[in-house]
Every structure is written in C-alpha cells, then in structure tokens.
C-alpha cells in the first residue's frame, strides 16, 4: 500500500510532495520570491522589479535577484530575476516597439475572444436551463387546468 500525502502547494491527496509539475514550479517560485523579499528587508532595501517589466507586453512578478556578499557589505542586486529573463530582454530589445505592441495586442485580443466564448457558452447553458424549467412548469400548470376542467364535465 502506497503512502498518501497532501500536496504542499494545493493540498490535494497525492503519493509525493507535489501533485504535479505545475504545483512544484508554483511552490518553488513562491519560496524563491519570499527568500528574496526577506533579503531585501534584511538590508532595508526596496525590492527592485525585473527589468523585463519595461518591455511592452511582458511582465514579471519576481523581484530582481539579490546575492549576499561574504562580508557584511551591501548585497549585489541584479537588473533581472534570473538569466532566462536577461536573455529574453536582450532578444526583445532587437525588435521594434511597434512590433512588440502589435504582438501584445494580438495576444490580448485572442485571450479576450476565448474568454468571451467561455462566458457565452456559460450564459447559453443558463438560459437553456431556465427555458427548460419554465417550459416544464408551464406544461405542469396547463396539465392541471386540463384535468380540472375534464373532471367538471
């Protein structure tokens, strides 16, 4: 019999620490973010935002990486949260502002379309459920009137 645990991230029942890769990434992200914020607080520094936030259509919720020195000097603060975003930033700088804006707006438009489709499907199912309940209650009330009129004859 396998032992069951609760996922550290979402609390669902699982056979390991995390229920899946998504929860594992989310938990590691959260821990890293909290450790960085503690270091900023320790040195009385204002948390710096990743420089990727300066590019149109890109954002990052992770504070810039911060490294403590061996001696009690001020820590080294990077412009980015990690190497992946530093590389992405460099590649995005090669593109024009208009190109980035167009790409961002196209993504946003696609997200809004999908969101709209989901909302419309939900509304349609609610309307159909109401129509069905109204139709069945109408049939019940009509059925009662017919039976009472028949018994009077």
Curated annotation (Swiss-Prot):
Protein name: Suppressor of RNA silencing
Effect of residue 33 to Q: Complete loss of BM zinc-binding activity
Residue ranges, annotated region (Interaction with replication protein alpha-A): 86-127
General function of this protein: Suppressor of RNA-mediated gene silencing, also known as post-transcriptional gene silencing (PTGS), a mechanism of plant viral defense that limits the accumulation of viral RNAs. Promotes viral cell-to-cell long distance movement by enhancing the ATPase activity of TGB1. Enhances RNA helicase activity of replication protein alpha-A. Suppresses autophagy induced by the host as a defense mechanism against viral infection.
Gene Ontology BP, a term: symbiont-mediated suppression of host RNAi-mediated antiviral immune response
Effect listed in the UniProt record for changing residue 60 to S: Complete loss of C2 zinc-binding activity
Post-translational modification summary for this protein: Phosphorylated at Ser-96 by a host PKA-like kinase; the phosphorylation at this site seems to suppress host cell death. Serine-phosphorylated by host STY46 kinase.
């Amino acid at each position: 019999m396998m032992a069951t645990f609760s996922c550290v991230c979402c609390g669902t029942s699982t056979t390991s620490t995390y229920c899946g890769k998504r929860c594992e990434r989310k938990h590691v992200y959260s821990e890293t973010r909290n450790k960085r914020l503690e270091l900023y607080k320790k040195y009385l520094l204002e948390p710096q935002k990743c420089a990727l936030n300066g590019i149109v259509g890109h954002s990052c919720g992770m504070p810039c990486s911060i490294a403590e020195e061996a001696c009690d000097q001020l820590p080294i603060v990077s412009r980015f949260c990690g190497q992946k975003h530093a590389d992405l930033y460099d590649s995005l700088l090669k593109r024009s502002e208009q190109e980035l804006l167009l790409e961002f707006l196209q993504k946003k438009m696609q997200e809004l379309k999908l969101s709209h489709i989901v909302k419309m499907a939900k509304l349609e199912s609610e309307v159909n459920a109401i129509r069905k309940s109204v139709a069945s209650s109408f049939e019940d009330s009509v059925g009662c009137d017919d039976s009472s009129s028949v018994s009077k004859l």
